[in-house]
Every structure is written in structure tokens, then in C-alpha cells.
């Protein structure tokens, strides 16, 4: 039996290892566009590789049907992943927040050990091979790569991901191949990505970073709230809180909804207490400019913009600020509104949303419901996880199940 795996990422790698361990007589070829496999693994977690998470459920995923992941997460939960990692010599560092990293704290350890496992099992790896199309003739799949017909195969796994990180040769060739076999897909979009905002003053806030709570409002209705770092940039906002909230925000943008963020700079302080603090500051320094006094509370980049939004002259002294204006300042700091107009795109995204419709794929085997012996795994499917190791774990879990089912003759 000959098997082709299109994409040497997490799901493709673990599928190959699993299948070969179960049947050493099969021949497996992995095709990857890069000079070496696992490039996205190397880039994950800022080079540290947030490889998994100890607490995982369908609640950590978005897509056409998030519960599609339930069977895979049950069959290949964190304990199963931990056991698998030990078989290739990969030791893990489990953090208190549930995030999991290689004990070496380097993503390179992950790719090295998986590569050694593939080599030991005699899996063929064809790097810098750009798969352009797949055809089915009789019961065989024909792979075309680098402008020529390559080989024929009994089974094919599409684990090529989507367009996130095009600098790593990420493309949507998997969707093109799926479409050629009659599959449909939901539109793709960047996920876990910085957000561009409409406000004209945004460049003046570049570099400001603070822990905040961020509320997401879609068409004026509250959707979600996230606590975490917010980084103001020349284009808008980034930081962990923004990456987390971007998933639902970007999905709403693709549906042409109005998307607004409301940033609370002091999430642990009530609006009344904040107003009292500001009033006390102004009372203690009545002859100083309000804008200068506010820098004891908030960044000196934010203070002048804050007064401008509250329609208070920047040269106004503290004792000239009335109670109504103080409440206005406190309210603005409690609910700073930003209109989201776009994202930073796939080149800055950690993941992609959208993809092959999961309703067309068996959730237990990950085989196509339309084409026998055609399989899908990982990001190419319309499943995207939250930040924190969830996307990589779905890649491992889906690839593992594919590996088990690639060896069966049905």
C-alpha cells in the first residue's frame, strides 16, 4: 500500500508515524513545500512551541461545528499525547495554566525528535515539493508536484494547512485539491491576529501596553470579554487579549457585521472608584495641568487623547475640571471604544479559520464522505482553536486518528 501525505506539519507527521508503527510494510511519502518539515511547529509559541494543553474540549474551538472535534479529543487526549511523546523521547513541561511546552523550551527539539522517528520508520520525505493537484484514476490517486506527474497512491492525506504564515510557504492548495474532488469549504480568514482600527489617533498610541479587559461587541451586542495584555500599534491593537478576541471579531468581519472593542484600562477598579481617584489627584494638585496629572494614572501617550475624546482642552488646569468631566474621563478609561475595520492578514496570523466543511468528513476516521481513501487533518478543516496549544493539539489528534485509519482496507 502506498500513501501520500500532502503537508509535513504536525498532523501529517504524526499520521505517518502512527500508520508506520501499525504497519511497517506500507510505503509513506510526505510532500512539503519547505526545505524541512515542521516549519510552523518551529514558529509556534515564539520559538518555544506551545505544543498542547492539559484541558481541552470543543469549547476551545470555533468552526462550522466545533463538536466535530469531540471524538478526536477523547481518543487522543492530553494523556495519550503525553504517552506518545515519551515514545519519541520528547519530554514535556506542563505549566500551571495548562499550557504545555517541550522541556527543552525549544521548538527545534520537537521537530528534531519527530524527524528522527520518521527516519527510523523509513518514511520518505520530499521537501521543496510543491503539490499542485491530485487526480484519481480508477482506484489510484496521482500526485502532481513541481510541474510533473510524481507517483500513484492508494490513499492520500491532505494536511497542508491553510494560508496563515505565507512566509512559510503556506497556501490554500489543500482547498483547491478538496474542491477538485467535490468538497466545499467555508471562507478562510486570519485568526489569532492583530486588529486594525478606524481611529485616526491610533499612531499616537503606538507602543502603549497594559493589562486590560477587552469587550467584543458585534452589531452593538455584547459577545465576549477577555482579560490580558493589550498593545497599541500604528495599525490598531495587538497583544494576547486581542489575539484571543480576534477569532470571533474576524469571523464577524467576514460576515460584514459591525465590530467594536471596548477596552477597560482598570478592570479591577469600579468606575466610581476610578472617578474618586481622579478627583483626589486633581484636588491635591489643583494648579497643575490635568493632562500632566493623568500621567500618574495612565500612559503619557494616552492622557492627551483621553482629554481630546472627552472634549477637554489639553491646557486645562485640574481645578477647572468639574465633576461631570471627571466622570466622563473615568467612563472613557472604563470603556475605551475602538472600531475594528480589518486584520493584519494571514502573514501575521497564528492560525486560519474556515476550511473544508466538517460535515463532509467522518469525525472518527477523518476520511472524506465523498471520496474513498481521501483523508483530511489539521488546519485545512473548518476548525480553529483558541490560543494556548489548542490548534497544535487538534493537529496531533486528527493526524493520529488518520494514521490509525490509513492502514485499514475497507
Please identify what each model-predicted range represents.
Residues 4-6, 31, 131, 150-167, ...:
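Short hydrophobic core segments
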Residues 35-37, 43, 51-58, 184-187, ...:
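An anion/pyrophosphate-binding glycine-rich loop and adjacent beta-alpha core
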